[in-house]
């Protein structure tokens, strides 16, 4: 078993004061996006299979998941690498794997390969994450949300590639 990947907290992305607020805003916007998209998919067999497996989309984005919020706060408080791993694993199991089925698979492109390769340079990837502008979330469209989701997904994919069967 290899050593655990360590995430260093980008100050702009998360700090003690805004971690929960950022999480809440992102969750709200992704829930709205997914809810809008799902209305067109009611008769789609893949959507029905997905819904049967994961239930309602909104249950995937665990807005009231206190453990998830607590883990994010712990991360923001520069918690141990072990806790950081718990965060990554929790994001994977409860959020990114299911959402990737909806948001990522239909829009995969060469850009994903470039992003994934960028993940090999953790400092570069953290810089990308730390420069996200959360002040204009109201203006984010589905493309923006999808791109941010993909950014997080590919980053966590790289960090966890030896830890999870993906």
Swiss-Prot record:
Record family assignment: Belongs to the orthopoxvirus OPG069 family.
UniProt keyword annotation of Lipoprotein present: yes
Annotated organism of origin: Vaccinia virus (strain Western Reserve) (VACV)
UniProt GO cellular component terms: host cell cytoplasm
This protein's UniProt keywords: Host cytoplasm, Lipoprotein, Myristate
Post-translational modification: Myristoylated.
Outcome recorded upon mutating residue 2 to A: Complete loss of myristoylation
Induction: Expressed in the intermediate phase of the viral replicative cycle.
Main subcellular location: host cell
Classification via InterPro entries: E7R_orthopoxvir
Protein name: Protein OPG069
Residues forming coiled coils: none
Compartments it resides in: Host cytoplasm
Lipid-binding residues (covalent, N-myristoyl glycine): 2
Pfam families tied to this protein: E7R
């Amino acid at each position: 078993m290899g050593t655990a990947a360590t995430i260093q907290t980008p100050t702009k992305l998360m700090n003690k004061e805004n971690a929960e607020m950022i999480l809440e805003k992102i969750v709200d916007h992704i829930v709205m996006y997914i809810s809008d998209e799902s209305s067109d998919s009611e008769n789609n067999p893949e959507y029905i299979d997905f819904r049967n497996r994961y239930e309602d989309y909104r249950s995937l984005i665990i807005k009231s998941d206190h453990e998830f919020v607590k883990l994010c706060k712990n991360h923001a408080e520069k918690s141990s690498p072990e806790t950081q791993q718990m965060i990554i694993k929790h994001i994977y199991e409860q959020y990114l794997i299911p959402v990737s089925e909806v948001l990522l698979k239909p829009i995969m492109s060469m850009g994903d390969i470039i992003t994934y390769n960028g993940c090999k340079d953790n400092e570069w990837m953290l810089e990308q994450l730390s420069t996200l502008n959360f002040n204009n979330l109201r203006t984010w469209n589905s493309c923006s949300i999808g791109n941010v989701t993909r950014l997080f997904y590919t980053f966590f994919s790289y960090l966890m590639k030896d830890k999870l069967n993906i």
